[in-house]
């Protein structure tokens, strides 16, 4: 069987351990009004049978607002993980970890729902999501 032709130069992305499983409660780090989010799905994540799909820094996931205003609650939103407690090893050997697991809400068009992000944002998330990087006050 012949090998398929490459689709151009592929950028090297280091592996980040996926540590935020479906069902996890995470902090909402933007000013959309939501306080606590619950991860309900990680799209495009393939896993073994009976194993929960998990997300890591920079991943898109579907969430439900658990704590916040009534108009935001009990609806499915998209979110991007911007911080995780588990250490992320970078190519230069540095390990970066944060004090909480946090995400920002994303509209279907890819814009952030809030206009400000509280706290630092991991560099892995800002590389994948430039709209998130624009609102970040601090990128670590």
UniProtKB/Swiss-Prot annotation:
Disulfide bonds: none annotated. InterPro entries: Ribosomal_uL14, Ribosomal_uL14_CS, Ribosomal_uL14_sf. It holds the Pfam family Ribosomal_L14. Keywords: Ribonucleoprotein, Ribosomal protein, RNA-binding, rRNA-binding. GO terms for biological process: translation. Gene3D superfamilies: Ribosomal protein L14. GO terms for cellular component: cytosolic large ribosomal subunit. CDD domains: Ribosomal_uL14. GO terms for molecular function: large ribosomal subunit rRNA binding; structural constituent of ribosome. Binds to 23S rRNA. Forms part of two intersubunit bridges in the 70S ribosome. Part of the 50S ribosomal subunit. Forms a cluster with proteins L3 and L24e, part of which may contact the 16S rRNA in 2 intersubunit bridges. Belongs to the universal ribosomal protein uL14 family. This is Large ribosomal subunit protein uL14. The gene is rpl14.
């Amino acid at each position: 069987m012949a090998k398929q032709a490459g689709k151009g130069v592929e950028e090297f992305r280091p592996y980040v351990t996926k540590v935020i499983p479906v069902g996890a409660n995470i902090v909402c780090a933007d000013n959309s009004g939501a306080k606590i989010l619950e991860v309900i799905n990680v799209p495009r994540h393939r896993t073994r049978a009976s194993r929960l799909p998990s997300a890591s820094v920079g991943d898109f996931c579907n969430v439900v607002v658990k704590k916040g205003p009534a108009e935001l609650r009990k609806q499915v939103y998209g979110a991007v993980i911007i911080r995780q407690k588990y250490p992320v090893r970078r190519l230069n050997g540095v390990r970066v970890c944060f004090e909480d697991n946090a995400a920002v809400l994303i509209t279907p068009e890819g814009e952030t729902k809030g206009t400000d992000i509280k706290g630092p944002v991991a560099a892995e998330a800002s590389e994948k999501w430039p709209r998130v990087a624009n609102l970040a006050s601090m990128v670590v």
